[in-house]
């Protein structure tokens, strides 16, 4: 027989539990191989109660800028202090540092290769360390799989409450790359740059709604094709026609 009282108690306890470990993963590993599963296994071996959320494992191989953008657009929607692991790491095994950092809303574990650039541009860095304390790594560290042997165990320990400062030596600066910015020409024309192309082929630009005055007189030009005005949805134009609109991230997009 179903026990309603027991069910209510379970929900209440779950809601009150503020110590649940929440960890996200973003990688370029794909899902055909064992890499993502191995990372999850390491995390669960340290914290069997951890909740692991996949943001994406379809980042183009070694595309640090794409990973930086994808994490930037996803992490604000997670609870504060979620630990976000980003492993797009063409320099694995080299002298590049492995780092963990705290920003205003979240914590991150990643290679120090610029993958945090968009996040830090939004909210800055409160604290950062180089992951030099091997106590929080796996006993044997592969030269080519720091995702499994350094980033995953560090994330699990961090989510369980190990202080950031205990993970390694403090850092005051980390690697970032210059972010594209829209350019406003003397005649009022705004020149934007493509930040990301999503899986539907939509172009996401660095231009935001506040960078120009909305109105029917807006003309956009892309690859020699002109778009008159802004739409609201994909169905505002016939099939095969381009439409420009403000997307869910607040950026100007072209579909």
Kindly label every feature range from the protein language model.
Residues 22, 46-52, 65-67, 78-81, ...:
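Active-site histidine-anchored catalytic micro-motif
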Residues 54-74:
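N-terminal beta-loop-helix "entrance" segment that forms/cooperates
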Residues 204-255:
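A conserved acidic, glycine/proline-rich C-terminal tail/linker
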């Amino acid at each position: 027989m179903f026990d309603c009282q027991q069910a209510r108690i379970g929900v209440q306890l779950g809601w009150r539990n503020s110590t649940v470990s929440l960890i996200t993963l973003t990688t370029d590993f794909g899902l055909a191989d064992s890499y993502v599963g191995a990372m999850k296994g390491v995390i669960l071996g340290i914290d069997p109660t951890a909740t692991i959320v996949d943001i994406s494992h379809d980042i183009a191989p070694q595309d640090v800028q794409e990973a930086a953008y994808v994490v930037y657009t996803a992490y604000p929607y997670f609870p504060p202090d979620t630990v976000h692991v980003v492993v797009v790491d063409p320099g694995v095994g080299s002298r590049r540092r492995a780092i963990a950092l705290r920003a205003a809303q979240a914590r991150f574990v990643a290679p120090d290769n610029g993958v945090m650039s968009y996040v830090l541009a939004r909210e800055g860095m409160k604290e950062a360390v180089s992951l030099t304390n091997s106590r929080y790594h796996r006993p044997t560290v592969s030269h080519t799989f720091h995702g499994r042997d350094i980033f995953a165990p560090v994330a699990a320990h961090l989510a369980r409450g190990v202080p950031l400062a205990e993970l390694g030596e403090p850092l005051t600066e980390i690697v970032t790359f210059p972010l594209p910015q829209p350019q406003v020409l003397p005649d009022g024309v705004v020149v934007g740059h493509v930040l990301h192309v999503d899986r539907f082929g939509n172009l996401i630009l660095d231009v935001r709604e506040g960078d120009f005055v909305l109105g029917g007189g807006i003309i956009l030009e892309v690859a020699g094709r002109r778009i008159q005005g802004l739409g609201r949805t994909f169905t505002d134009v016939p099939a095969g026609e381009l439409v420009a609109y403000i997307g869910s991230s607040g950026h100007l997009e072209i579909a």
